[in-house]
UniProtKB/Swiss-Prot annotation:
GO CC annotations, alphabetized: cytosol
Annotated compartments: Cytoplasm
EC number: 2.7.1.71
Organism ancestry: Bacteria, Pseudomonadati, Pseudomonadota, Alphaproteobacteria, Hyphomicrobiales
Keyword Phosphoprotein: no
Family: Belongs to the shikimate kinase family.
Amino-acid positions noted as binding substrate in the UniProt annotation, renumbered to this chain: 60, 84, 106, 163
Protein name: Shikimate kinase
Gene expressing this chain: aroK
Cofactor (UniProt): Mg(2+)
Primary localisation category: cytoplasm
Binding site for ATP: 38-43, 144
Pathway connected to this protein: Metabolic intermediate biosynthesis; chorismate biosynthesis; chorismate from D-erythrose 4-phosphate and phosphoenolpyruvate: step 5/7
Cited PANTHER family: SHIKIMATE KINASE, SHIKIMATE KINASE 1, CHLOROPLASTIC
GO molecular function: ATP binding; magnesium ion binding; shikimate kinase activity
Length: 203
């Protein structure tokens, strides 16, 4: 069965001045998390949304809800191209839904039209993880269709080579590593504030 769509409760009244400045500067733009499977987009995204007092949505969960199938079932029944088409439609819809934190699947940013829409309508944040970190994390999960291969480490290396050049187009890059999640969230908040609110350099 597909997972239920989810949001997190907002806590706007508890925002720090820095967090309030970020939300004001965002306007109606979402913060979109991109990166490889296992980079921590959903975990960090939920916590970042709580810090900013914004809704959180996971694009993969929304895709499953729209299709009434899990992502592995979509891959098995219809194939990856069908999944990517649906993914692009869902993300396009979510980008029009106001300010939020949105976690996207690892392959979503590879589609040019999706990159263009994110660039136009959102602030993109890449959670960059090393191959060994990704492999260690995803080995615990059985629901990764692209890793159902005899050589998961080789598959991850290939995906990194394909995807990281495009991920580098993100507005903000955060190193995802094995530290407490709140430390990563602190870095996300600081980077968002620097990107959105820092005064431009004086001439």
């Amino acid at each position: 069965m597909p997972r239920m769509s989810e949001t997190v409760p907002t806590a706007a009244a508890g925002r720090s001045p820095q967090e309030a400045e970020i939300v004001a500067a965002l306007g109606d733009r979402p913060v979109v998390l991109i990166g490889m499977m296992g980079a921590g987009k959903s975990t960090v995204g939920r916590r970042l949304a709580l810090r900013l007092g914004l809704p959180f949505l996971d694009a993969d969960t929304e895709i499953e809800s729209a299709a009434a199938m899990t992502i592995p079932e979509i891959f098995e029944t219809h194939g990856e191209p069908h999944f990517r088409d649906g993914e692009a439609r869902v993300i396009s819809r979510l980008l029009d839904g106001g300010t939020k934190v949105l976690a996207t699947g690892g392959g979503a940013f590879m589609r040019e039209e999706t990159r263009d829409r994110i660039r136009e309508k959102a602030i993109s944040m890449w959670l960059e993880a090393e191959a060994d970190v990704i492999l260690r994390r995803v080995k615990r999960r059985a629901d990764r269709p692209l890793l159902k291969t005899p050589d998961p480490a080789g598959t991850i290396a290939r995906l990194i080579a394909e995807r990281y050049p495009l991920y580098r187009e993100a507005d903000i890059t955060i190193a995802s590593r094995d530290v407490p999640h709140e430390k990563i969230v602190d870095e996300c908040v600081a980077a968002l504030h620097d990107y959105l609110c820092a005064a431009p350099p004086q001439p």
